[in-house]
Structures are given as structure tokens and as C-alpha cells.
Amino acid sequence: MNEKPKILIADDSEINRALLKEILGDGYDYLEAEDGAAAVELMRQRTDISLLLLDLMMPGMDGFDVLRVMKYHAWLDEIPVIVISATEDTANIERAYDLGVTDYIRRPFERIMVLRRVKNVLMLYAKQKRLTRLVTDQVYEKEHNSVLMISILSHVVEFRNSESGLHVLHIRTLTDLLLHR
């Protein structure tokens, strides 16, 4: 059974959190944080968060502080962030993007805009993770094939030229050590 994507909504307004949950519907599981500190604590405890909907202007630890913590811990690599804020200050919007947000939705917003952007961001991150897995698998497979080829060639060299196949394997090990420095 596939689990629903888990969305963390960090907003100091209970009404805004309820509105976002109502707009997004039953297709997601929700976590709620009333401030930045609670959002950070939830991200420390949970590894199953698929998306963060973040308000920038909150008392105490604000959205910018949350983004700095996420950047420091490299959580932005795993958790996309959509800022939903009433601020129209271009400097704040630019600052949010510089800190690593994926998207920015300005309040008041259209229902369809929130739905589409959330769906698109989740889909893009899922594709990115799948591609990363594929590339990683290919790199491991290529390295395995390379090691296998060197082993075969060392046996061929030993058999054909009466040279030590062990010598070829030692050269491979030394080369590998030098390349990793």
C-alpha cells in the first residue's frame, strides 16, 4: 500500500493551516507547526516529510530561520519548500529563493494555484529522486564491470605473457588509491 505524501504546514495562523489542508484535500497526510521551532523539531524527528509549506513571517523562529537550519542540515536536498506568504517585498522573496525555496505563492492565492504547484513540486522531486537512484545504480554497475574487466585482463596477461597477473592487480589497487586522494 502506497503511503500518502506527508506535508508539513508551518504557519502561525491556525486558520491558514486549516485552509491549506482543506484546499489540498485527502490526498495527503499533514503535520502542523505553529512556528519555525516546531517545524524544525518535526523535521529532526521525521524522515517521511515530502513537502514543507512555509510561512515566512512567524513569531520567534521565522521562515528565514527555518530555511537557514534546513540549508545547514542539507534537508533542502530531501524536502522541497513552498513559501506561502502575504509579503510582497521583493527583497524577502529573493532572500527566500537564495536560501533554497522551491516555489513561492503569494497570499491571497487561488485554490487551483496551490493544488497545481504542490502537485508539480512533489512530482518533480519524485522524478529527481528516481533519476538519482538510476544514476547511482549505473555508477556502481560500471565500477563493478570495470573491476571485473581488470581481473579478467590480469588473468589473460598472466596466461599469455607469463607475467604476473598479481602484478596487474597491484597496479590497479595503487591506481585506485591515487585516484581517491
Predicted features along the sequence, with ranges:
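Two-component/phosphorelay signaling modules centered on CheY-like receiver
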Residues: 2-6, 13-31
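C-terminal output helix
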Residues: 91, 109-118
